[in-house]
Amino acid sequence: MTETMLPDPGPEQLPDLPEHEVVVCAVGREYFALPLESLAEIFKVSEITKLPLAPSYLVGVINVHGNLASVLSLGRILGLEDAGQEGLLLILTPDHGGIALHVDTTTGFTSYTVLEDVARDTSAKGNFVEIIEGVFRDDGKLISLINPEKLRVWIDSEFTKGDG
């Protein structure tokens, strides 16, 4: 019996996938990312004007270059620890509805090529699945990608619940 050696195919060629640039932030022990193109600025938390009778996740409003932005606690939206009085505000671009997300910190910028799906857990506290596009790994951390459009739709639906 003669044994034939097949040629080594070499490293498997994967298709060139586009890289997506994101800013990574943390709330408690969880990591999240926002597409870089959806981010206008990052501010240290400063004076936030509180709104009476607002839902708990709506921390208040701030003036961003003469425009009002709603400050939303990412931790409260997702049912996680609240960032408290400290932290950073991630100001989304105006086409995302004048939103400033309150987070604990940012850890930097990175990119990803492939997202993993998020399993739906209907018993989970918070609104994790509604605004998360998927997850990816970076430096051993599991990072959940926030879809700004899904966030805006979720906010709109929350505000219209009381309109009967």
Where are these regions (language model features)?
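An acidic, low-aromatic, low-complexity terminal/linker signal
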Residues: M1-G164
